[in-house]
From Swiss-Prot:
Name of the protein in question: dITP/XTP pyrophosphatase
Keyword annotations from UniProtKB, A to Z: Hydrolase, Magnesium, Metal-binding, Nucleotide metabolism, Nucleotide-binding
UniProt subunit comment: Homodimer.
Lineage: Bacteria, Pseudomonadati, Pseudomonadota, Gammaproteobacteria, Pseudomonadales
Matches recorded under CDD domains: HAM1
Source superkingdom: Bacteria
Family: Belongs to the HAM1 NTPase family.
Gene Ontology cellular component list: cytosol
Gene Ontology BP term (one): purine nucleoside triphosphate catabolic process
One GO MF term attached to the UniProt entry: ITP diphosphatase activity
Task performed by this protein: Pyrophosphatase that catalyzes the hydrolysis of nucleoside triphosphates to their monophosphate derivatives, with a high preference for the non-canonical purine nucleotides XTP (xanthosine triphosphate), dITP (deoxyinosine triphosphate) and ITP. Seems to function as a house-cleaning enzyme that removes non-canonical purine nucleotides from the nucleotide pool, thus preventing their incorporation into DNA/RNA and avoiding chromosomal lesions.
């Protein structure tokens, strides 16, 4: 069991910071990398795992603290796993609304039965920048892509992601519900076990 009282999150995304802090609980204080640097590392990996490790090492190097990185995205089966690791930049960095519009366009004539997808989250935790044994935890959240946006909670692709176990979109879920069901929640549950917090 490892004891981490402070971690730096390798993200400038306030929504992600809030979500992960709620899942971690109060025994660990999560800092944003934005407290140390505004520079985003180049995500040169070809997988969620590679990018999560790269971001965690970069955050540990900049902050001097143990670092937690999340690399997550949406993998749509009909699109061969796209947008995948490019989820945040799917519409050339133009933001959530543009990403959602591009996804709907890509699936324009695709029937409901072929719109299966999963949110993927890989968490990487490093004790220091050169940690030879990062802790890796993966969470998957299976659903499908809607034909139009629904709900106003969450961020990213949440308004387009149908959650079969709740019969609504991810953006229709209250944050507390999402924090129990999501890909990030599943990965975080594994991480909490690894850290002896569960």
């Amino acid at each position: 069991m490892m004891n981490f009282q402070q971690l730096v999150l390798a993200s400038h995304n306030a929504g992600k910071l809030k979500e992960l802090q709620a899942m971690l609980g109060h025994s660990v204080q999560l800092h944003s990398i934005g407290e140390f640097s505004q520079v985003e590392p180049e995500e040169t990996g070809l997988s969620f795992v590679e990018n999560a490790i790269l971001k965690a090492r970069n955050a540990a190097r900049i902050s001097g603290l143990p670092a937690l990185a999340d690399d997550s995205g949406l993998a749509v089966d009909f699109l061969g796993g796209a947008p995948g690791i490019y989820s945040a930049r799917y519409a050339d960095g133009k933001g959530d609304a543009a990403n959602n519009a591009k996804l709907l366009e890509a699936l324009k004539d695709v029937p409901e039965a072929e719109r299966s997808a999963q949110f993927v989250c890989v968490l990487a935790l490093v004790r220091h920048a050169d940690d030879p044994l990062p802790i890796l935890c993966e969470g998957l959240w299976h659903g499908r892509i809607l034909f139009e946006a629904s709900g106003d909670q969450g961020f990213g692709y949440d308004p387009l992601f149908w959650v079969p176990e709740r019969n609504c979109s991810s953006a229709d879920l209250a944050p507390a519900d999402k924090n129990q069901l999501s890909h990030r929640a599943r990965a975080m549950a594994l991480l909490r076990k690894r850290l002896g917090l569960a």
